[in-house]
Amino acid sequence: MLMDFAKHRTSGAATPREIAQRLSRSRRDFLRDAAGVALGSSLLGASPFLRGEAAAKKRKMIVVTFGGGARDQETFAPEGQENIPYMLRELIPQSSFFTQVTNQGILGHYVATASLATGVYETLNNFSAIAPEHPTVFEYFRKDLKRPSSDAWVVAPSNGFNRIGESESRSYGPGLGARVVLPKHLLSAASSGALKDYQHLVRDNYETPLYTPQIGGGEFELQQLEMILKLSVDDFMAHARTVSSPDELSMYIVKRLMQEESPSLLWITMHDIDIAHSGTYSLYVDAIRRTDRLCAELWKTVQSEPEYAGNTTLFILPDFGRDADEDPGGNGFQHHRTGDAASRTTWMMALGAGVRQGVVYDRPMQSIDLVPSLGAMMGFSPALSQGKPIKELL
């Protein structure tokens, strides 16, 4: 019998840990019913992941994070399943799904994503264009495995993420980070700053109008277009006119990167769902549906690109959740400011090479466990990370 979704909603008598466990169990039971997945055990045998030096050289990882997360009411619940048809029908049946991933850090999109990328709960100012304090996964990957800069990329829709690829760490830092593509900067450069017809693609921050980073873009971005992405200005602008959101533009850039550069470590941040801060419920739901579709499109691209098919693991996870309806300090779907269990307890799915298919795990883990897991799977050591490798993936 499917657990009544209402049972996991917050109450004054429940502790944050109890609420997190209820959320996890509710997601688990819903997915077992709706997607036909089985309850997994950490006592399973070794992962089917390919081992050996030759396999490691071909191994690729793609991480998709999306800003703000979405409530279970609009996703992993009977009343929300219509918004995630691709996840339920195509992605989750092929994945290992983790229902209780907690974020114990600061619930701001840049700082939370930086924490995901370093494996340490960063404490930087969420609205400052500064690099993470601790080494990023890209630096560990490139230094330990002696990989070139072309093998690690970040595609980020928000201008505030331009420092995400490289830390301030003296042991790593300068010259060892990922290359970062900001599609809004590409658009600004290609249009010579004439963005009047592209306002729906350059809106940068939904959370506070007081923080509006300048939309940059110049000769460097034009070189990225022409030399790396093999796109003419005319072709790029023509495609920009066909997309409806920043994340759609980002996914177009991602596909070009996969075709032209084929990086072994590719990190994508998506941000459309954070339009929830506008307070318009219909736009929030539309963004969930768009994100669901774009994730499925990315997985199809992975399977169709010769450099990625059969040797790629895809991770999809929100940076954190959203406030619960019942929390008097929040505003339901609109924000993530209370720090309650609903805003901190999210999920992750992994699918592709080496991942057990159609399995759901409900034990607690933390979002900072991602980087140590990537290191264990790819063969590098994230020495300063504070998370733990996810044993179900190893």
Label each region the model flagged.
Residues E74-V111, D151-W153, Y361:
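Short, structured active-site-proximal loop/turn typified by the sulfatase FGly-forming signature C/S-X-P-X-R
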Residues P78, S167-E168, K230-A238, M251-E297, ...:
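Active-site His/acidic residue clusters
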Residues F138-R142, R363-E392:
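Non-catalytic, well-ordered alpha-helical segments in soluble enzyme domains
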Residues F127-I130, P135-A238, P246:
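A contiguous, mid-domain pocket- or channel-lining segment that forms the substrate-recognition surface
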Residues L317-L351:
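Histidine-centered active-site microenvironments of extracellular/periplasmic hydrolases
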Residues R25-L44:
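N-terminal export leaders
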Residues M1-S26:
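N-terminal secretory signal peptides
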